[in-house]
């Protein structure tokens, strides 16, 4: 049997599984390498010929649990656990 239409029904093994770094189904099982982010290599795989792909995966497209709070915390020089001073005099005199 050739590799054309008739043989596609016989394909049942997965060559790629989920990658632990990027989460995509791009980790090649036999090669042990991710085709999307190049895990386990230290440097993440990006190419400028795929600008749209970089735009999809860049910082700001996800939740940014930590990073979205940094500008607000920067205003107070990253102080934490202190009591805020009252803004108006009436609240300051009553307490």
Swiss-Prot record:
Any Pfam family the entry gives: Ribosomal_L37e
GO molecular function, one term: rRNA binding
Cofactor: Zn(2+)
Keyword presence, Ribosomal protein: yes
Keywords, alphabetical: Metal-binding, Ribonucleoprotein, Ribosomal protein, RNA-binding, rRNA-binding, Zinc, Zinc-finger
Task of the protein: Binds to the 23S rRNA.
Chain residues that bind Zn(2+): 19, 22, 34, 37
Keyword rRNA-binding listed: yes
InterPro entries in UniProt: Ribosomal_eL37, Ribosomal_eL37/eL43, Ribosomal_eL37_CS, Ribosomal_zn-bd
Protein's organism: Arabidopsis thaliana (Mouse-ear cress)
Gene Ontology BP, a term: translation
Cofactor binding comment, as recorded: Binds 1 zinc ion per subunit.
Zinc finger (C4-type): 19-37
PANTHER family associated with the record: 60S RIBOSOMAL PROTEIN L37, LARGE RIBOSOMAL SUBUNIT PROTEIN EL37X-RELATED
Family: Belongs to the eukaryotic ribosomal protein eL37 family.
Cellular component GO terms held in the UniProt record: cytosolic large ribosomal subunit; extracellular region
Protein name: Large ribosomal subunit protein eL37z
């Amino acid at each position: 049997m050739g590799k054309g239409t008739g043989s596609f029904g016989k394909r049942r093994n997965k060559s790629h599984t989920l990658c632990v770094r990027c989460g995509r189904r791009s980790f090649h099982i036999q090669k042990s390498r991710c085709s999307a982010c190049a895990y386990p290599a230290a440097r993440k795989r990006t190419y400028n010929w795929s600008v749209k792909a970089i735009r999809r995966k860049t910082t700001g497209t996800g939740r940014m649990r930590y990073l979205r709070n940094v500008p607000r915390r920067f205003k107070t020089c990253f102080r934490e656990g202190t009591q805020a001073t009252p803004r108006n005099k009436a609240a300051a005199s009553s307490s």
